[in-house]
């Protein structure tokens, strides 16, 4: 059983970065819990432990000691950036690391960038405690800048946090070679959606407000990602990169 350790940054008496009506500790916990839930919903062959599942205080040493004693296979620390920049970046230790550390990070970075429209700030290295003191491959992600209005507005959207979490979950699964559960896109058959209403909006991103183009009844599209929750509804991502509702009132899903 593969052991995944999720570490929502900060918490309790340590709010982390604070700006634009947001607290880093709240956002990191939301993303980590969503990541856990997606992994448990879509993948098998793993177990997950978290440094915290509520607003509690944990020192850096407590986090790495817990992961080390548990024997985690991968340590993923989730953070929100600050300092006036914009975009997503992630870090591995700037000292000697295993090949898996690099490979795992590359896969995670790629999957997150598939999901978000943050500026890609690249793959970096640093001497952070959680990267240095963890005895397994470890990565620290920085998901947008809390003190930059454009990034903060995205972080205020629960649907956008879903996308960040989906990127983390899929990246972790790719890195560790987790198997998809049957019924969650792993059947080997290609999925399609057919529009069954006279006209229907598609979306540029997984956001009901980000409308793209109208498609018409009878049009069929290749599904790139099985349905996932967005706000109060569900969407599919299409091979074209656009998104479409998964409501059976408007589309028919089938495989072949």
Language-model segments: what does each one mean?
Residues 14-16, 100, 201-204:
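Short, solvent-exposed loop/turn elements at domain surfaces
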Residues 10, 52, 94-96, 127, ...:
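Short, well-ordered turn and helix-capping elements at secondary-structure junctions
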Residues 2-4, 22, 26-184:
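Active-site-proximal helix/loop segments of hydrolytic enzymes
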Residues 12, 19, 113, 156, ...:
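Hydrophobic alpha-helical context, especially transmembrane and signal-peptide helices
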Residues 12, 114, 146-147, 201, ...:
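Active-site/binding-pocket entry motifs
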Residues 2-21:
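Short glycine-rich His-centered loop
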Residues 185-235, 243-256:
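Beta-loop motif signature
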């Amino acid at each position: 059983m593969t052991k995944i350790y999720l570490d929502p940054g900060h918490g309790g008496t340590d709010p982390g970065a604070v700006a634009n009506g947001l607290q880093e500790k709240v956002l990191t916990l939301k993303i980590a819990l969503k990541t856990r839930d997606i992994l448990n919903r879509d993948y098998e062959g793993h177990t997950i432990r978290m440094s915290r599942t509520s607003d509690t205080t944990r020192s850096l040493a407590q986090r790495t000691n817990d992961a080390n004693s548990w024997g985690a296979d991968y340590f993923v620390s989730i953070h929100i950036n600050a300092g006036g920049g914009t975009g997503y970046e992630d870090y591995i230790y700037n000292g000697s690391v295993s090949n898996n550390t690099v490979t795992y990070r590359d896969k995670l970075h790629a999957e997150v960038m598939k999901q978000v429209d943050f500026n890609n700030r690249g793959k970096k290295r640093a001497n952070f405690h959680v990267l240095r003191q963890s005895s397994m491959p470890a990565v620290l992600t920085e998901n947008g800048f809390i003190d930059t209005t454009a990034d903060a507005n995205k972080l205020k959207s629960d649907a956008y946090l879903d996308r960040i979490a989906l990127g983390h979950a899929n990246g972790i699964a790719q890195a560790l070679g987790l198997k998809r559960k049957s019924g969650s896109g792993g059947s080997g058959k290609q999925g399609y959606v057919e529009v069954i209403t006279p006209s229907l909006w598609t979306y540029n991103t997984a956001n009901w407000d980000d409308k793209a183009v109208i498609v018409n009844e009878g049009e069929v599209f290749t599904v790139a990602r099985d349905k996932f929750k967005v706000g109060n509804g569900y969407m599919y991502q299409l091979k074209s990169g656009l998104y479409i509702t998964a409501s059976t009132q408007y589309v028919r899903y089938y495989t072949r």
